[in-house]
């Protein structure tokens, strides 16, 4: 190849890379918070989809009207939220229905009910399918994300509750709150092909790393978490929080209901409802090592992270700087009232369209 052609090719690659960086750097980063996201309590943000500007101190931007009302016209508690950059849509489940909204027009495209109700769902990376758990019952529905129609049903008899789609789109992780086993479904066949566990008790919130080799699970009765090897299906470790006692909790009946990996997978953050704290663990060692704790404004029941790993978002509405461990903001609505929710997702906009979406779960994103 002639030198000038080589240089020209390099220049094109560099310009392309710069353009991609500029598009990402110039993106408007917004946090979408679904309400009511603490049971059906309206005092923590009312009803709707609240939008906050991440780069402007998490300032309140707007409230988008949503559906999800019961027969008396009162808001049902939100169970999950998921969004797709591929389709520009956002989905909200309540105890009875799932609603699909167009993010650009902010219009409701459809709302559908499913036999057995709904719980915390997960969407495929291409935005085409959603795995929707029934409300603590025996099955998951696999749903066409464009139409809301049911494609098939997966029966686990586990008290279906929480769902994570693997980043590669090949596996979906299905946790029921009446089973000590984490079920894993193959997304090509929509069948459970393997499990991880058993863990010491029924699984509550959980997370997985990017390579899908490890899972970290909350279980009933434990102030702490357990670690599972996804490859072998075996439980590896049990980690109990040191220096704090278990006690009564406002919700969930579980000492630790919320766990997440920082995107770089260097840390694991764990909720502690009774003590109104987040406990931080070094996840570069096994088992993860407890390193510090952060006091929050209320009892946390969930935690996730910004895509860049700079902020942690416990359900209390505190915004925590991951590096300094300091609370740097608190979510507030248009009236100045404190906002809390266990259902939130980060969405990036550029050129009038959605270019990237986060996840309601604090999943690992470390590139291998």
Which stretches of residues belong to each language-model region?
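Bacterial N-terminal signal peptides
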Residues: 8-17
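Bacterial N-terminal signal peptides that target proteins for export
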Residues: 1-8
């Amino acid at each position: 190849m002639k030198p000038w052609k080589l240089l020209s090719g390099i220049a094109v690659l560099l310009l392309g890379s710069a353009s991609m960086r500029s598009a990402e750097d110039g993106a408007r980063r917004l946090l979408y918070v679904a309400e009511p996201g603490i049971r059906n309590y309206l005092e923590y943000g009312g009803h709707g989809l609240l939008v906050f500007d991440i780069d402007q101190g998490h300032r309140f931007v707007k409230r988008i009207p949503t559906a999800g009302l019961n027969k008396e016209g009162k808001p049902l508690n939100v169970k999950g939220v998921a969004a797709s950059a591929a389709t520009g849509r956002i989905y909200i489940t309540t105890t009875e229905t799932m609603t699909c909204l167009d993010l650009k027009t902010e219009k409701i495209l459809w709302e559908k009910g499913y036999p057995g109700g709904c719980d915390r769902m997960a969407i495929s990376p291409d935005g085409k399918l959603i795995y929707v758990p029934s409300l603590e019952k025996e099955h998951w529905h696999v749903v066409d994300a464009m139409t809301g129609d049911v494609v098939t049903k997966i029966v686990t008899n586990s008290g279906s509750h929480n769902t994570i789609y693997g980043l590669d789109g090949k596996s979906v992780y299905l946790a029921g709150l009446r089973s000590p086993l984490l079920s894993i479904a193959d997304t090509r066949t929509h069948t459970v092909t393997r499990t991880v566990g058993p863990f010491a008790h029924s699984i509550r919130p959980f997370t997985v790393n990017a390579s899908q080799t490890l899972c970290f699970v909350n279980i009933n009765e434990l102030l702490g978490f357990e670690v599972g090897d996804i490859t072998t299906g075996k439980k590896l470790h049990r980690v109990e929080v040191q220096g704090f006692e278990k006690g009564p909790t406002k919700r969930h009946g579980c000492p630790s209901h919320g766990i997440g990996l920082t995107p770089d997978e260097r840390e694991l953050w764990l909720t502690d409802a009774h003590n109104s704290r987040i406990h931080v663990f070094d996840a570069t060692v096994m088992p993860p090592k407890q390193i510090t704790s952060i006091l929050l404004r209320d009892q946390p029941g969930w935690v996730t992270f910004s895509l860049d790993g700079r902020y942690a978002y416990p359900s209390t509405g505190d915004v925590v700087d991951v590096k300094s461990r300091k609370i740097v903001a608190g979510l507030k609505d248009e009236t100045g009232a404190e906002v809390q929710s266990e259902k939130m997702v980060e969405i990036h906009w550029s050129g009038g369209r959605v270019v990237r979406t986060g996840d309601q779960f604090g999943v690992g994103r470390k590139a291998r």
